[in-house]
């Protein structure tokens, strides 16, 4: 997630915001949404080096989903965390998609892809095998197994 490990979660929210071109007011506007979504409790004020990998993922996802990106890249975000957090992520991704943001969703979970995507690209050995509907991509995948 590209965190500064000696900085706190809160400091990393601002660092990521600055790196993405946001100013103090813009970051302050989304700060509480990030904190609430990440749900790290008191750990938000602890150095990121004390976080588990799941906690880092939660904070990274919370930052990236709340900055209102033009393109959102989600790489296996739904493979970690408990079922409640995974559902919260799916719901938030669907909210972002509904606003017209392009989402590049990378997953090995058939269910997650079917619930999230309207288009899929099936890659094998780094080459595009199918670029079409989710059903077309899975049909091709099932035949190649």
Residue positions per predicted region:
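Conserved ABC ATPase "signature" region
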Residues: 14, 26-43, 60
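H-loop/switch region of ABC-family ATPase nucleotide-binding domains
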Residues: 107-108
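A short, surface-exposed alpha-helical micro-motif characterized by mixed small hydrophobic
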Residues: 113-115
